[in-house]
Regions:
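C-terminal beta-strand-loop-alpha-helix "lid" module of Rossmann-like NAD(P)-dependent dehydrogenases
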Residues: 1-292
Length: 292
């Protein structure tokens, strides 16, 4: 059995650790609420932009096909994955699950554009598919960061450097679980952007566009993709904070259990020491009486 002094030191050490895990839980909770609020603030804008594109797409000519819809019929298309990981650890298996999902779906010739320090460090000089000069942080997603990534993605797609671009991120399924998902950014799915039919009649509706539908789509489609990336970044950041809250809550509960067990052991140790001292005192007193 460990000494009372050593047990007391262990209890104090675990109590200090528990204060840290509890503080990290509260910080992640605050960041989660703020990130969700920021996303809700801009969601109406991107929702309206999505509705606008749905009204524009039916008016686009079938020929020539807009480059954003062009499916390049290649045997080995050049694919890129924009991967959203975290800047920090201590979030359970959040980063590991995402990277495992990525490796399961990617081919040897694909390219990884990683956002987040943890994912970047995990692949740096270990996986040749990592684009090392693409380096963005994942903390506190901003519209400007999402816009910069969108511009780079569109330029690489239009120039033919890339044939397909996907976003890989962690999506919150419910209050307790989240899982990695993959969504295609480019080329866009024309059928997915078509408006839902509302009764009989032409889904194109009576809409006049100036100067033409092609130009309007050329201006609005990048904003739609910008919204896709910002939404994925925010969702991923929220999932990270949720995972960290779960991990820190579990760590705090484990610390409480350890403290409880150690306190029982500490009390038994003290009780044993006191009993031994009493026994020694009684034995000493008896010896004195016998000598007298």
């Amino acid at each position: 059995m460990a000494s009372s002094k050593l047990l007391k030191e262990r209890i104090e050490s675990i109590q200090d650790t528990m204060k840290i895990t509890n503080a990290m839980y509260l910080i992640s909770s605050s960041k989660l609420r703020k990130a969700r609020q920021n996303y809700q603030n801009v969601l109406p804008y991107f929702t309206r932009m999505r509705d606008t594109i749905s009204r524009v797409v039916p008016h686009l000519p079938d020929e020539p096909e807009h480059p954003f819809f062009h499916e390049r019929d290649l045997e080995n298309p050049k694919r890129a994955y924009i991967v959203l990981t975290a800047d920090k650890g201590m979030a359970g298996a959040y980063n590991q699950n995402l990277l495992k999902f990525l490796r399961e779906h990617a081919d040897q010739n694909d390219r990884f554009y990683v956002i987040g320090q943890v994912g970047y460090r995990a692949l740096f000089r270990k996986d040749p598919r990592l684009v090392e000069d693409f380096h963005y942080g994942a903390t506190a997603p901003t519209l400007q960061r999402a816009r910069d990534i969108t511009v780079d993605a569109i330029d690489d797609f239009k120039s033919g450097k890339l044939d397909e671009i996907y976003i890989v991120y962690t999506k919150i399924q419910n209050a307790l679980t989240s899982e990695p998902v993959m969504e295609r950014l480019l080329p866009l799915d024309r059928a997915h952007l078509m408006p839902a039919p509302k009764g009989l009649g032409d889904p194109r509706g009576e809409v006049e566009m100036f100067p033409d539908a092609w130009t309007v789509f050329e201006q609005t489609a990048p904003i739609y993709m910008h919204g896709m990336i910002f939404g994925a970044m925010t969702e991923s950041f929220c999932a990270e904070q949720s995972a960290r809250m779960t991990a820190m809550d579990s760590a705090t509960k484990s610390a409480k259990d350890m403290i409880h067990d150690l306190e029982l052991e500490y009390n038994r140790s003290r009780q044993g020491s006191i009993t031994q001292e009493i026994t020694e005192i009684i034995g000493g007193a008896a010896a004195v009486q016998n000598n007298e």
